[in-house]
Regions:
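Intracellular juxtamembrane helix-capping segments at the cytosolic ends
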Residues: 29-52, 186, 281-294
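C-terminal transmembrane helical hairpin of 12-TM major facilitator-type secondary transporters
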Residues: 231-286
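Long, low-complexity inter-transmembrane loops of multi-pass membrane transporters
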Residues: 100-162, 166, 177, 181, ...
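Transmembrane alpha-helices of Major Facilitator/SLC transporters
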Residues: 199-231, 249-252, 313-317
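Glycine-rich segments within core transmembrane alpha-helices of 12-TM secondary carriers
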Residues: 32, 44-76, 80-84, 88-92, ...
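Extracytoplasmic gate region of multi-pass secondary transporters
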Residues: 152-217, 283, 287
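Symmetry-related core transmembrane helices of the 12-TM Major Facilitator Superfamily/SLC fold
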Residues: 80-98, 332-350
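Hydrophobic core of transmembrane alpha-helices in multi-pass small-molecule transporters
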Residues: 15-32, 267-281
């Protein structure tokens, strides 16, 4: 709300207000999604779809800026639009104080354990079959209301988490670069400013499709959860359903990069469609993976650490913009294809870890 008010009062005489305004809007948005995504734990079945719906609503927020742009073209000032937007933020207070749970959304009886070799023993989610522990337990059992720093550090140091942070950083850099350079791409490939404005509107309309694409991504994740719910290993039941979606997201990033290499105006619509698919599945998996693979008591902390780390990493986009301006945008896109290829290590590693966990369970039997 404060960010929207500050942007509303930004003028040519006070241009610097845009920076604290946008920073506050970004901070508020991230805080909201970090909180609301944990609601998926309230649903024994369909948690992945819930994450998809919430991510879709977050993803389609670009439509708000489209409304501001269209309103400005019709004579509605930016100040008026942002004052109206700020007033609608009162609804978040209603949701926070009347509807959201006041504590962790998981029952406090749920327990997790930290192991020595596979440092995280995934807790059983409601609705899933109970499973055996992967290794001998080396730390005390802890309930959700006894969160401690040492356990959080152990979770952060696991390949299950570190590789996900790497995956998020690399794919988000790809996303931020295209969003930051799309206007330059349109100006280069189109003939006049009116066409650039028209295609910008089309892109924003297409991006609003995230509210449909993200729930579909969540439904696809739910399908994978049902396929692997009878896995012998509890680790596999929590991690394996994510592998297909993680791989699909990386593949979409490669396709998007190849389309950008072609530099053909006739491909712009394809770029917009693949962009909304890529962004929707990406943001769904950023959150859904952590929700499924880690204890609910740590979800907020882990999503927050992931968000901050990837945000700092994505400052590299400015170096990519400079590289593109001084040399060639094709070189940057080829470089990003290589980075996306590296991101495939994440689903591949998790697949190997799941196979090993299942083999150990088979050996015990």
């Amino acid at each position: 709300m404060c960010g929207a008010y500050i942007i509303a009062f930004t003028t040519n005489d006070l241009p610097w207000l845009i920076f604290p305004g946008m920073a506050l809007v970004a901070f508020g948005g991230i805080s909201l999604i970090m909180t609301n995504v944990q609601l998926s734990n309230m649903f024994p079945v369909g948690g992945g779809a819930v994450v998809g719906i919430i991510s879709g609503a977050f993803d389609s927020s670009s439509g708000i800026q489209l409304m501001v742009k269209l309103g400005y073209e019709q004579g509605i000032s930016r100040k008026t639009s942002y004052l109206i937007l700020a007033s609608t933020h009162v609804l978040t207070f209603v949701s926070t104080f009347l509807f959201l749970p006041k504590d962790y959304v998981h029952p406090v009886q749920e327990e997790y354990v930290v192991t020595q070799e596979i440092e995280l023993e995934i807790p059983e989610k409601p609705g899933l079959d109970s499973g055996k522990t992967e290794k001998k337990v080396t730390s005390k059992t802890t309930s959700d209301n006894e969160v401690n720093l040492s356990s959080l550090v152990r979770l952060i140091r696991t390949p299950t988490y570190l590789l996900h942070v790497m995956w998020v950083c690399l794919l988000q850099l790809r996303l931020f670069y295209i969003l930051g350079s799309i206007n330059r791409i349109l100006e280069k490939e189109l003939e006049n400013k009116k066409e650039v404005s028209d295609y910008t509107n089309v892109m924003l309309y297409v991006l609003m499709g995230g509210i449909v694409a993200s729930p579909l991504a969540g439904a696809f994740l739910e399908l994978n959860i049902s396929l692997f719910k009878n896995s012998k290993s509890s680790f596999s039941r929590s991690v394996k359903p994510n592998i297909m979606s993680l791989t699909l997201t990386s593949a979409l990033g490669v396709v998007l990069s190849v389309l950008l290499l072609l530099e053909d105006p006739s491909h712009l619509y394809y770029i917009f469609v693949f962009l909304v698919l890529y962004r929707s599945i990406f943001y769904t998996m950023v959150n859904a993976y952590i929700v499924l693979a880690f204890p609910s008591a740590f979800i907020g902390s882990l999503i927050g650490i992931t968000t901050v780390t990837s945000g700092v990493f994505c400052l590299l986009q400015h170096a990519l913009f400079e590289w593109s301006a001084r040399r060639n945008a094709k070189e940057v896109n080829i470089f990003l294809i290589v980075l996306i290829g590296i991101s495939c290590i994440h689903p591949f590693w998790q697949w190997i870890a799941c196979r090993r966990a299942e083999q150990r369970e088979s050996t015990k039997e």
